[in-house]
Amino acid sequence: MPGQTLASLATVMLVSVTAYANPASLVPGGVDSVSGSDQFLAQSRVNVIGAVDYEYEHDTSTIWRESDKDTTADPLGALPRHRDLGFRQDRHTITPRLAVGIFHDTFFTAALPVVITQSRELHLDTGVTREGSSTVQSGLLPAAGYDAQDPTTPPSGDVMFRGPTRHGIDQIQLGLGFAPMNQQRDETKPTWKLGAELRLAIGQVMKFDPMAPGANSGVSSGVHELKLWTSFDRKLDWVEPWVQIFWQVPLATTSDSLFQEPGFGAVNTAKSQIAGVEFGCEISALDNVTERNRISIDIGGKAIAHFEGRDYSEMWEVFAFAGDSRGTGPLILDSDPVKTGVQATSYPGISNIENYLETTAKLAVRAEIGPHVRFVVGADIVWKTDHVITFADAGVDLPTCGSGQTTHCETTNNDVVNPGTVEVNPLHVGGIDLVGHRYHSEDNFGIVLGVSGQVIF
């Protein structure tokens, strides 16, 4: 009888240790060679995790424009900025996920986010008229506006631009992870995981053609990226704090990606890098250890640093509209600044974006129904710091040529980018990149609602 009691107590202790809920605590353990007293642990290992996530995202922001024509502005004060447009985007995404244990806390992961629908539009901001919009005055949009879903009819109300409805796949995410520490194996230690994830761009690249606005409904950036991450989790009775840190960097692009290197004096042409931290504390509201039923509340946050680089902004489709080389728009580029005349090429739409910080408040309710089924319902509130979204440099001022030097230098000794030389950045457009003409994204606010279901074996 004492032996049976001890065995039962050990079983309950092991079950309680494995009754985790948040993702930082789950380790698909894979196959272990165990025997004797460790056989129960082998049977309780999490080897396969299948999940399906659904997210609805709603984002808004205000587009401001710098002005160098305000005669009433204080010449010693800050550069005047004026309201111009309001932005709204809605997106629905479903993501199937799979994590498979390989051997002794080493696991493989895969995910395939599928954008079901994405819609976005720009409207006149408070107090702005169609004729008074600086975007209209600069010739980027007609005063009547443009509706990509019905190009022959101007948009109604205060809508200035409505983009095409988009859907599809951006990247497939393939990863490998390892847990140097696992609380399931040793309850005196936290769960510590390390991982790397390769994000391969496989979907249709997101582009905009004013002559055929409905021809491209893609959502992919056409950029292959690498994500490195680590996470820590520690269950302490009825509370479970956790944290995850990550860094994501572009590696290469597909042949039709907009993130191409044009040469000459172009700098910062790659997609923006990001790095962030996500954290939370899961609090048990109901924990039935015997039947493996549990309800918990997870309160946390997230901070993501977006580093300077090129990316899709709120205005990217408008910029592509105004930079179509088949027309006469103000954003048409010169692909070869050294040749005489203009070698017209279309503005891709993506632009250089200033560093900014994204912060998120997170709340989730998690439920475990037995040892194999889990559900999560969550809501996020997202803020982004104000930042400039047209930020391309005019080029690179090369050093003066030394004795016998003929390349990567200039013959004149000055501190400016000389027009008509290799110093010029072909992606720079004074009409939106020069100080006094730049666009700003401000008052960013977003809401994310999500539901997730997991099956664990």
Where are these predicted regions, by residue range?
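Surface-exposed strand-loop-strand hairpins of Gram-negative outer-membrane beta-barrel proteins
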Residues: 24-26, 54-93, 123, 209, ...
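Transmembrane beta-barrel strands of outer-membrane/channel proteins
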Residues: 48-58, 110-114, 192-200, 243-249, ...
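Residues on the lipid-exposed face of transmembrane beta-strands in outer-membrane beta-barrel proteins
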Residues: 54, 96-102, 110, 174-180, ...
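Gram-negative outer-membrane beta-barrel proteins
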Residues: 56-64, 116-122, 182-184, 200-208, ...
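Outer membrane beta-barrel transmembrane domains
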Residues: 69-70, 253-457
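Outer-membrane pore/translocation modules
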Residues: 117-270, 400-413, 418, 423-437, ...
